[in-house]
Structure formats: C-alpha cells, structure tokens
C-alpha cells in the first residue's frame, strides 16, 4: 500500500499516540485506511469494468478515482464503472484516493485488460506481441506509417491551448536523437505494473521512465570502462557526442520481461571507435543474452569503383542512423557514412534477436559516380512478409559474402530497394523515380529522401488488393510503387506506378511521410504540410488539404494518433529555431487545433527539438525528443 501526496490534495498525519487513540499498530483509526483493495480486472471490448474499494476512518469519507494519474470526472464513490470499453483501453491503470478531514490514502494501482477478437489492419507491424497501446519501434510500426491507432484520450475536439499543454521535461544526460518508445503494462521486479517510456541519449545512456509520474525506473549507461561517446569530428550539423543515434526497437516476447535492442558508439582511451549491439531487459535495464556483442562484418566488394577488394566494416567510418528494425527474429541496422567519411558506401547488418550473434550483412557501394546509399533517421521499413525497403537517393551495388554482384544502374536517382531477409540479406528488386522531372533537379545529387512508407494492404474499387509503398524525394517528387513488382528485370528498372511532381518543395527531407485513413501526409521544408488521398492505388495529384503555415528549413517530423479510424490528429515537430509542437485535424489540415506558441508567457516552450525525430503519442500524452531530454505534453489539470 502506498501513501503519498497527490496534487490538489493534502496528506495529514495525526499523532494519535499522544491522544491515546491509536490501535494496536500505533495507527489512528480515524485516519482513512483501505481494508479491501481494488483488483486487476479483465473485460471484453464493448462491455464495462467495475473497480471497488472498501475503506474505514472518521466519516465522512470522500473518494476520487484516477486513470493514468488524472482524476475521472464524477467518479467519487467507493466503486467506479468505466465507460464502454474499446480495444485501445487495454492496459489502462486506475487507483482511488480516499480522504477525510484528517488525511488521505491512495489505493494500489490496478490494471485493466481489455480483450478483443478484432485484428488491427492499420500497419504492417511484424513485432511480436505488440499491444495497440505500445510504440515499440521508430515511426510507430514496422511499415513506418507514423500511425498510433490506440489513442483514446486526445482528439481534435478536446485539443486546445486551454486544456492541453506542457507537463514537464524528463531530463537525460545528453541530446536525444532517437524516438521515445512506449511499452504498456510492464511488470517490474518489485511487483508493480507500469506504463514505461524509453529514451536513449547521445551520451550512451538508456532510460526507463514511469510514463505516469515521470520517475526514473532505471538508467543503463552503455559506455565500457575508460570509454566515452564518439564525437562528430568536423560536422556542425550533428551532435557533438555520438552515443546512441539509431532509434532502438523493443520485442516484448524476449527475455523475462521483454528486450530493447540498442546500438551504442563508444571510443576507448586510445581513440579506437567501437560499436556494440545491446539487448536490455525492459523492466530492469540489465544486459540480456550475454551481451553486448561487438559489431564486425566483412564482404567481397569487387565492382567498377572498388574492383576485387575485400571490405571490412570500420566502426569509425560508418554511423548507425536509421531506426532499428525487427523482422523474422532478427534485428536489422543500417550504417551510413559518418560525417562524410566513406561517402561512397554503406552497410546493412542483422543480428539474431535471441543471441545477438551476426545473422547476415550486406555491403552497398555505388555502381558509378560518387553517390552513397542514403540512410536518414527514418527506420528501415518492413512488410508483413519480412522484406525490407529503402528509399534513398544513390547509385548502388550490393555485395554479400559469396554472392554475385548485383549492380543498379548509375541513373538510379531516388531508388526504391527491396531486400529479402529469409536467408541472410539479399537485394531482390528495385525501382527508380521517373526522370520526367526537371533535369537540374534529377541530376543535382544534393537532395535527401524520406525513407520508404509501407502502406497497409489497399483494396481498389475493382476489389484488387495492392501492396504499395510511398516515398517523398528531396527533388520535389512523391512516388507510389507496387512492392510486389518494383520492376528490376535483367537489371533494367521499369517505371513505377506513379510519380507526382511539383506538389512538394525541392528541398531536404529528413523523415518519412505518414499515413492514416487512405491519406498520405508530407512535411517537407519550405512547404505546408500536405495531405494526398489514395484511390485506386494512385495518390491525388494535388493535396486534398494543407496547413496554413509553411515549414522552416528543417521541415517537420510527423506522426498521427487516432482511436482506430476516428479522432485522427496529425502531430508535427518543427526544429527550425525554437522547437514547436503543432497539432492538426488529420481530416482537414487547415484546421490547426494547437501549437506550443499559443499559450501566454511561454508556458509550453521547450528546449530545442532535434531535427529528425517524430513525436511519440501514447496514453494521452505526447513526447518530444530535445537536446536535453524529453518534453512531455498532455491534458492540463
């Protein structure tokens, strides 16, 4: 039993000893006391659940029930019956505060489990044991759609500057360049059950915060003895420390409580850069599977640029940027050039999720010219079949140990690449953006791309099921592809399904698009946020809605929250200048419902946002990565 002060309530201690009114335990019987605690409850979606408490103490006793530490309006009796439950109410937490004129006492926190026979089709998530309330990977699911469809508390109708705002900041020991992750209903060694927010810093630390109270549950530093994070060298656009840059991934089926997989960069006292893959217990932060494991790889890399040369992975030359992916029992990571070093090549590697041992590697080099395979912070995308996808501006050759070279022509431009993960790693198909755009744009080689968005199965008006992928290029294009037939046949790419030109700015893109309700969203620097409708496997050639504001030089990182198919909110974080969090009605982007500049006296201002991390929305709160921690937003009391 916990006794603690709760905001808005006073906790009073009575010294009954001096009054001769104590019971045999030395406790004043007039103080409120709980004799029968509420218990964990399981109920089906579409029904209700009831929690009950029995308390003693001097009358009158007052009751106030809480959900996720927020008081429930009208829930002021010894029992509380929920509203009709939805699947997204699964793993909700409740407690009751009992008060009289002498003091207050909290009940144990109890868990509501909601069962359902329905299957979500909102994403192509291949993570094991994923709960609708969870956010276990970069951009919310394996397909990188950016959709969190288990949000019941935040809707366009209740988001405004009066009711919603900044709640506080979770402090970390370095810049946070990874997306915060969220696991609901984590059982802790103490026996408590908590919703937990995970954050990783560039100083090489992983944090588990109580998502309700903000308390640190555990912190694990991944620096070895006499080690420090690596640095950014001469780069001015990257953090001075480089410890953990790629968003981790969580598998709730691994280990005693679940595992969070992390890649950390360190540098020893001699200046040698070391990269390791870790698996940490999500409840304790302890290393799992005899980890960590040193990252090493080699490949045969004979091609027109680097003829007959053997390639060994050099941790000092390659940086893990893309969010980690979990497919077919393997953790996948992509390594791009570190601050311009080795700018002609990159790597994809996989690690066994049960042992952390190497499970395959692929070295990617340009077939011709200087362009390197482009990885942004957007994670490697995956579909339900376990295939991986990359969308980036580059020219490629692919090499795996013992395999024949597969060369992609030098005109690849914005290339979609498909990789099989069934037996190691293999490039199996690809396509490239149409060259019908302006020649100066196609040949510039200076733009970045969004990463690939894997669209959930889409049925057209004729009943045909399409397996689509989307990508926005920094050259001002948006592409729609059929993942089943990208077009590589005899090394001659064929046109993709659709390329839209002129509807997005020709500028850098650092994050994926987002997708909700047959609508794709783009948020490119120098452009409004735009929505494009998907019909008959084609996007509308003009936006169906767009924001009134134009984005700055860094564009915006976007996510969508919804309660299944309703209540969609598009969230955007801008990092140009002071950080700004914005919220829009996802069905009409011209309807902006909130932003952090609206409140007086800088009430909702937060430390500078980082440039490539989308916001995480879970449990009625929004978490934004910053240069000093995680800014937390939610309903104000």
What do these predicted regions represent?
Residues 16-35, 116-129:
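Bacterial Sec-dependent N-terminal signal peptides
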Residues 125-460, 464-489, 509-532, 555-562, ...:
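Mobile, glycine-rich extracellular loop/lid and propeptide segments
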Residues 66-84:
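Surface-exposed, flexible coil segments in extracellular/virion-facing regions
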Residues 63, 94-95:
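Hydrophobic beta-strand segments within extracellular beta-sandwich modules
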Residues 57-64:
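Solvent-exposed loop segments of extracellular immunoglobulin-like
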Residues 36-40:
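Surface-exposed, proline-enriched loop/turn segments that connect beta strands in immunoglobulin-like
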Residues 47-55:
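A short beta-strand segment in extracellular, disulfide-stabilized domains
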């Amino acid at each position: 039993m916990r006794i603690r002060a709760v905001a808005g309530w006073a906790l009073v201690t009575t010294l009954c000893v001096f009054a001769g009114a104590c019971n045999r335990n030395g406790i004043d019987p007039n103080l409120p006391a709980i004799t029968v605690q509420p218990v964990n409850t399981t109920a089906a979606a579409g029904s209700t659940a009831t929690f009950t408490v029995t308390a003693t103490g001097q009358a009158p006793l007052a009751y106030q029930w809480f959900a996720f530490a927020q008081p429930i309006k009208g829930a002021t009796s010894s029992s509380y019956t929920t509203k009709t439950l939805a699947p997204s109410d699964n793993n909700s937490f409740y407690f009751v505060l009992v008060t009289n004129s002498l003091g207050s006492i909290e009940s144990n926190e109890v868990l509501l489990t909601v069962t359902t026979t329905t299957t979500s089709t909102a994403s192509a998530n291949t993570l094991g044991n994923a709960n609708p309330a969870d956010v276990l990977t970069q951009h919310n699911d394996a397909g990188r759609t950016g959709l969190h469809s288990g949000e019941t508390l935040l809707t366009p109708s209740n988001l405004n500057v009066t009711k919603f705002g900044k709640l506080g900041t979770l402090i970390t020991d370095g810049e946070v360049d990874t997306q915060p992750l969220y696991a609901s209903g984590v059982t802790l060694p103490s026996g408590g059950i908590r919703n937990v927010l995970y954050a990783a810093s560039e100083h090489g630390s992983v944090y588990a915060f109580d998502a309700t109270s903000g308390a640190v549950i555990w912190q694990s530093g991944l620096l070895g003895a006499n080690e420090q994070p690596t640095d950014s060298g001469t780069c001015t656009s990257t953090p001075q420390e480089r410890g953990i840059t790629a968003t981790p991934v969580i598998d709730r089926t691994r280990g005693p409580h679940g595992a969070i997989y992390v890649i950390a960069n360190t540098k020893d006292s001699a200046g040698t850069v070391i990269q390791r893959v870790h698996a940490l217990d999500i409840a304790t932060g302890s290393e799992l599977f005899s980890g960590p494991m040193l990252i090493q790889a080699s490949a045969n890399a004979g091609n027109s640029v680097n003829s007959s040369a053997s390639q060994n992975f050099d941790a000092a030359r390659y940086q893990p940027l893309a969010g980690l992916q979990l497919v077919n029992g393997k953790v996948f990571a992509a390594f791009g050039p570190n601050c311009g070093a080795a700018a002609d090549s990159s790597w994809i590697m996989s690690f066994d999720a049960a042992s952390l041992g190497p499970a395959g590697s692929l070295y990617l080099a340009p077939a011709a010219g200087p362009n390197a395979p482009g990885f942004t912070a957007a994670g490697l995308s995956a579909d339900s079949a376990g295939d991986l996808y990359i969308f980036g501006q580059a020219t490629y050759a692919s090499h795996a140990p013992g395999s024949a070279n597969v060369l992609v022509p030098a005109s690849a431009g914005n290339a979609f690449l498909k990789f099989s993960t069934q037996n190691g790693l293999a490039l199996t198909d690809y396509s490239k953006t149409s060259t019908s755009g302006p020649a100066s744009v196609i040949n510039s080689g200076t733009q970045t791309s969004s990463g690939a968005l894997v669209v959930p199965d889409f049925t057209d008006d004729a009943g045909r099921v399409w397996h689509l992928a989307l990508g926005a290029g920094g050259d001002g294009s948006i592409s729609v592809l059929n993942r089943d037939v990208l077009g590589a046949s005899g090394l001659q790419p064929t046109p993709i399904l659709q390329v839209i030109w002129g509807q997005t700015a020709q500028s850098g893109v650092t994050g994926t698009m987002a997708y909700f309700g047959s609508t794709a969203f783009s948020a490119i620097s120098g452009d409004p946020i735009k929505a494009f409708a998907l019909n008959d496997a084609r996007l509308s050639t003009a936006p169906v809605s767009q924001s009134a504001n134009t984005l700055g030089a860094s564009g915006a990182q976007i996510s969508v929250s919804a309660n299944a198919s309703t209540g969609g909110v598009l969230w955007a974080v801008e990092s140009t200048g002071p950080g700004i969090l914005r919220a829009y009605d996802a069905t009409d982007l011209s309807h902006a419902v909130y932003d952090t500049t609206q409140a007086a006296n800088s009430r909702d201002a937060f430390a500078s946002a980082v440039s490539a991390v989308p916001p995480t929305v879970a449990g009625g709160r929004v978490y934004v990565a910053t240069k000093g921690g995680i800014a937390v937003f939610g309903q104000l009391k």
